[in-house]
Amino acid sequence: MPTQAANEALAILRDASQFQWYVITLLLVVIYIYASEIHQKNYRAVFAGLAFWGMDWFNEIWNALVFHFTNYAAVWMAPGKTAYLILIGLNIEISMMFAIMGVAATKLLPEDRKAKIFGINNRIFYAIVLSAACVVVEIILNAANVLVWEYWWWNAKMPLLIFLIGYLPFFLVAYWVYDMDLVEKQAAVSFGILAIDAVLLIVFAGLMEWI
């Protein structure tokens, strides 16, 4: 039987009547950030950002599938106020935030990919620090009851999986793409991740209507 939070999320899932005009402003911010990077020919930041965004979409898809198969709860849910709830744990505001975060994360990186911070490779160091910071933000959002967790192994008292699954792979993949030598490789990986996401959405949301 679905939890209260799950039912609340389902009640507004892909409900266009929830739309708010601030979404247009958020969209313009995302477009501006990517357009600025493209104008500066900083394509590695663009593809790192897209890879990061694609990684989140993959997580959101399997999270929604957890609810489908359990009929109890997704691992995380976003039942609160939103301009559009795309999936049970993903609203339009969160999605745009993730679209920006990958680009922003590259701004911390030194040019020397082998440079160390406190004896740790800078890419790994920033991936760990930023992932930990994101977990802290999620705990605050959970405390505010806008991001709901129902499982004992995924909550404020057990943050390790949130760190290891919810964020660390995103930053590691984004930095991996960022450091690739060829733009063609960066594009292939980023668009490949997004293509997989698109296929999964077509199958599970469009054809099977599971999520």
Swiss-Prot record:
Lineage of source species: Archaea, Methanobacteriati, Methanobacteriota, Archaeoglobi, Archaeoglobales
Coiled coil residues, start to end: none
Membrane-spanning intervals of the chain: 21-38, 53-75, 82-104, 124-146, 159-178, 188-210
Localization per record: Cell membrane
Membrane association type: Multi-pass membrane protein
Protein name: Uncharacterized protein AF_2236
Keywords: Cell membrane, Membrane, Transmembrane, Transmembrane helix
Source taxon at top rank: Archaea
GO cellular component, one term: plasma membrane
